[in-house]
Amino acid sequence: MMTMRRHLLLVSNSTLHGGGYLEHCQEHILKFLGAQVKRVLFIPYALHDRDAYAKTARQKFEALGYGLDSVHESPDPVDAVKKAEAIFIGGGNTFRLLKALYDNDLIAAIRKRVLEDGVPYIGSSAGTNVATISINTTNDMPIVYPPSLKALELVPFNINPHYLDPDGNSKHMGETREQRITQYHEEHDTPPVLGLREGCFLLVEGDKATLLGITRARLFLRGKNPTEHEPGHDFSFLLGHS
């Protein structure tokens, strides 16, 4: 197995209640990208209006001191990925995002840049979903049909962004998020699922993974009871799961 050079910042949500776009994690983004990165390649495929989405992301990253290029503005998306200093994939609909990644032949290109070349990768919400083994545990509606649910596989487990605890006062009779993840684990040979509540994110550096942010994460392992974990918890053992 090749040595992983991955540097990932996998964020549950782009906007935290009461704050601005990426405001809750901007200090971590600055530390993550550092001074060596000058420009970030943004992948806006998860939303329909890519121009407006790129404008929002560009304003934020320029305020942080980085230039931003959007892959949809490039005549050759694969070449744009090959030249990227850092990659940021934003949130939206995960099915739409993954289909566009396949349609533009970016799966292998992104994997090579991140896992072999060590290019920093930031994912938010849907961008975090596609960084995992598959999008089986996304919360989104399948509004389009990608050729596969298999994703970038930058980590060997799945993540459920925006993880939501059951509301004991609600009269809603639909399944809880925990019940849906449990259903997923009723299927044979399904990987761990890390439920990231809004306000937390996972930092992956090589073979080390650490929970950051202000909220806890809930870990689901097939055949076991879910467990709660505070910010600062070491999730490196998940990187050895296959």
UniProtKB/Swiss-Prot annotation:
Protein name: Alpha-aspartyl dipeptidase
Role of this protein: Hydrolyzes dipeptides containing N-terminal aspartate residues.
Transmembrane segments: none
The protein's enzyme class: hydrolase
Principal subcellular localization: cytoplasm
GO biological process: proteolysis
Disulfide pattern: none
Cited NCBIfam families: PRK05282.1
Reactions the enzyme catalyzes: Dipeptidase E catalyzes the hydrolysis of dipeptides Asp-|-Xaa. It does not act on peptides with N-terminal Glu, Asn or Gln, nor does it cleave isoaspartyl peptides
Entry EC number(s): 3.4.13.21
Species per Swiss-Prot/TrEMBL record: Xenopus laevis
InterPro entries reported for this sequence: Class_I_gatase-like, Peptidase_S51
GO molecular function: dipeptidase activity; serine-type peptidase activity
Keyword Electron transport: no
